[in-house]
Amino acid sequence: MDTFSVVFYETLSGDKPAKVFLNELSDKQRAKTIRDLKILELYGNRLREPQSKYLEEGIYELRTKQGSNISRILYFFFVGKCIVLTNGFVKKSMKTPKDAITLAVKDRKSVV
């Protein structure tokens, strides 16, 4: 089974929002998220709920829960077997924040 490659989206100024988000998580939450990213690399577009969910306009969310902490990293699939991580957030409500999705869609359009 071929694995996918996971890369961080990089802005024109060189920032990598998903990487910054990942580094800001607690050690336990970061470890679980990295574990989930490895699962995403392995299963790619075959990964389904509860780990991954399609949102809209080609954007998916990787869902990680550690205790009462729930984090999400938004991503999209690119040419070949490439997964681009755009941004992340700690979930505080039942719905994914619209501004986070809008940012991910904008980032996707700048790449595709």
Residues covered by each model-derived region:
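Basic, Lys/Arg-enriched alpha-helical interface segments
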Residues: 1-70, 79-83, 92-112
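ATP-dependent carboxylate-activation loops
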Residues: 86
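Residue-level signal for short, function-critical loop segments
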Residues: 89
